[in-house]
């Protein structure tokens, strides 16, 4: 069952910001250089776009407005052909297809909720001619295992340059097993300022996810051989299956502040066309761009249990609390500076070239070991401490400098490509290497559009902190 509401009303057009460069303003501009930008569709009332990693290049992101099978969009299976998860919407999930798995975060506890977390690469930005509102509500399941999801987005333009908006996503799922429910809340405020010479996209987001934990079933035969345990019952409620523990929660919280901006350098070219008043039209020709991106993340994780039975699952306990209360947190600040030569910056150059440097600072906070407590050769506590004067946490700092470059061709249909390389130059991740690329070609096949696309990467990276 689903309810959907969509209201449309405000709009602006993304300006053409990637016209190719001409070495002289007196030269004629070929028609190929006057084609619309990949993120400029002036005929549409609403345009949705996303940003490329680190550099913030805008590209069109299709907006799903199809009502056919809309209810399936909430299902976890809508994210991949094969997903492993805990039966209900909002539970930790991971795709089973290798090439769909993303590089793990240093804060690995958020990886299990990747489908529900907004990042700079999956965040939507908008350009509207009329105010736009979309509210969706989906629900499913019986009263004992009901799942509800409410999503909404509101955005509008102020003139042709400024767009602001906000969105929220709320999931409440009771789960199909004992101690299997979850509650997820996330929201985001975003905005953009786009002119020929200056572009800015920014957002701040926050999420708070709470997930009940049960450690799994005590007997897998309830799933593998349910008839053997039915005891002459036709149906057994899955909520009655015995689990390893209850009264246990896993809370993951996070916030993010993201801003990317660029200043385009170039010149103004007069066209042969005139406006309604008879003035000669002018178009800005960008040659290069100076780019700055700042990304700050703050994440926290807390694992709480009031069930004494959890001691049978985790034989080694850390700390002196009567109940389990494990906490950790981290933050990282990433600054990227880049210089880009726009695609077609010379008549012979049918590609764009970008060089960048990234400075990343990370801090992790863990519960400290108790002085006087014998942790043994494996680090596990085995005796009472001799003192209670001990710090509550320990802090670990990391810093890394990366350099990299990108070669891309995003215009045209016959052949487009993008190749990016990144090297950890100094610091905690010195020696890290990332090389990734994609290639796409389009052609006619039996009078139909056909596309062939290839992707690949080579990585040599350090393990996540945890």
Located regions from the model:
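Hydrophobic/aromatic-rich, well-ordered segments within soluble, folded domains that form packed cores
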Residues: 149-173, 435-437, 441
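Outer-membrane beta-barrel proteins
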Residues: 38, 140-142, 171-190, 244-253, ...
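Exposed, low-structure sequence patches enriched in small/polar residues
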Residues: 14, 128-130, 244-307, 312, ...
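Transmembrane beta-strand segments that form the barrel wall of outer-membrane beta-barrel proteins
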Residues: 131-141, 164-176, 414-427
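Acidic, small-polar-rich N-terminal luminal/periplasmic segments of exported/outer-membrane proteins
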Residues: 21-129
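Outer-membrane beta-barrel translocator/channel fold
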Residues: 82-85, 176-184, 190-255, 446-466
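Single conserved hydrophobic/aromatic residue that forms the stacking wall/gate
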Residues: 1-16
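Short strand-turn segments of transmembrane beta-barrel domains in outer membranes
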Residues: 105-111, 119-153, 175-176
């Amino acid at each position: 069952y689903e309810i959907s509401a969509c209201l449309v009303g405000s709009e602006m057009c993304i300006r053409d910001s990637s016209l190719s460069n001409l070495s002289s303003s007196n030269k004629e501009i070929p028609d190929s250089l006057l084609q619309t930008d990949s993120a400029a569709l002036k005929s549409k009332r609403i345009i949705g776009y996303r940003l490329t990693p680190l550099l913030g290049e805008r590209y069109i992101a299709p907006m799903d407005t199809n009502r056919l099978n809309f209810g399936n969009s909430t299902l976890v299976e809508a994210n991949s052909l094969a997903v492993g998860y805990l039966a209900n919407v909002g539970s930790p999930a991971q795709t089973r297809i290798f090439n769909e798995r993303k590089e793990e975060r240093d804060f690995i506890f958020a990886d299990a909720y990747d489908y529900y977390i907004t990042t700079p690469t999956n965040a939507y930005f908008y350009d509207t001619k009329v105010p736009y509102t979309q509210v969706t509500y989906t629900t499913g399941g019986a009263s004992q295992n009901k799942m509800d999801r409410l999503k909404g987005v509101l955005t509008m333009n102020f003139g042709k340059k400024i767009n602001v908006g906000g969105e929220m996503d709320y999931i409440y799922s009771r789960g199909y097993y004992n101690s299997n429910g979850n509650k997820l809340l996330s929201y985001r405020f975003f905005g953009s300022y786009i002119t020929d010479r200056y572009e800015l996209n920014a957002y701040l987001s926050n999420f708070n996810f709470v997930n009940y934990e049960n450690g799994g079933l005590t007997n897998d035969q309830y799933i593998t051989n349910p008839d053997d345990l039915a005891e002459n019952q036709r149906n057994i409620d899955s909520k009655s299956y015995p689990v390893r523990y209850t009264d246990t929660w896993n809370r993951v919280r996070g916030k993010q502040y993201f801003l990317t901006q660029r200043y385009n350098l170039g010149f103004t070219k007069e066209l042969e066309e005139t406006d309604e008043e008879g003035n000669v039209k002018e178009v800005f020709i960008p040659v290069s761009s100076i780019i700055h991106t700042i990304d700050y993340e703050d994440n926290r994780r807390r694992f709480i249990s009031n069930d004494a039975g959890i001691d049978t699952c985790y034989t080694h306990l850390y700390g002196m609390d009567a109940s389990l209360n494990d906490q950790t947190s981290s933050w990282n600040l990433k600054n990227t500076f880049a210089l880009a030569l726009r695609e077609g910056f010379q008549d012979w150059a049918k590609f764009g070239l970008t060089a960048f440097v990234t400075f990343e600072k990370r801090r992790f906070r863990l519960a400290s070991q108790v002085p006087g407590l014998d942790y043994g050769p494996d680090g596990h506590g085995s005796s009472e401490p001799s003192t209670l004067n001990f710090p509550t946490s320990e802090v670990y700092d990391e810093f890394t400098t990366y350099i990299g470059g990108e070669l891309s061709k995003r215009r045209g249909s016959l052949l487009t490509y993008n190749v990016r390389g990144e090297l950890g130059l100094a610091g905690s991740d010195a020696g890290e290497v990332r090389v990734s690329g994609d290639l796409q070609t389009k052609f006619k096949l039996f009078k139909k559009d056909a596309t062939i696309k290839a992707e690949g990467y080579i990585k040599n990276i350090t393990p996540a902190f945890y």
